[in-house]
């Protein structure tokens, strides 16, 4: 139960921070381009790289700290960072074909799922 609570706390903090970054970007840059989403995705990818190296490799941190920072905080801040780490991990293990398939499938299927969800709701509503 404590592990789920750590994920929830980290997720809440990450989500609130994502909201503030989005609002800041909207005020600074305007609504013409999703700058806030781009910013959290890029920053989240950088931070997951830092956390993955420090927390799992350099300091051998506890499962609880990993859940709080990586699963919780970055999961709330951006899920794109987890996707990127998974893809890089495949490439680092020498599984370039699997990495390419994972990237193409993730982006392609996710886009298709959004289009399908939009189409279904537009047809029903």
From Swiss-Prot:
A GO MF term: metal ion binding
Keywords: Cell inner membrane, Cell membrane, Ion channel, Ion transport, Membrane, Metal-binding, Sodium, Transmembrane, Transmembrane helix, Transport
Residues that coordinate or bind Na(+): 75, 78
InterPro entries per the UniProt record, alphabetical: FluC
Transmembrane regions listed in the UniProt entry: 1-21, 32-52, 68-88, 101-121
HAMAP family: FluC
Protein name: Fluoride-specific ion channel FluC
Organism of derivation: Rhizobium etli (strain ATCC 51251 / DSM 11541 / JCM 21823 / NBRC 15573 / CFN 42)
Gene: fluC
């Amino acid at each position: 139960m404590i592990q789920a609570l750590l994920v929830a706390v980290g997720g809440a903090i990450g989500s609130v921070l994502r909201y503030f970054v989005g609002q800041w970007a909207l005020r600074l840059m305007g609504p013409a381009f999703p700058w806030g989403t781009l910013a959290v995705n890029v920053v989240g990818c950088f931070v997951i790289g830092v956390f993955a190296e420090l927390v799992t490799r350099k300091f051998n941190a506890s499962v609880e700290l990993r859940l709080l920072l990586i699963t919780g905080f970055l999961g709330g801040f951006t899920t794109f960072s987890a996707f990127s780490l998974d893809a890089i991990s495949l490439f680092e293990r020498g599984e370039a074909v699997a990495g390419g398939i994972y990237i193409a499938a993730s982006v392609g299927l996710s886009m298709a799922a959004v289009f399908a969800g939009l189409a279904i709701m537009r047809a029903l509503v």
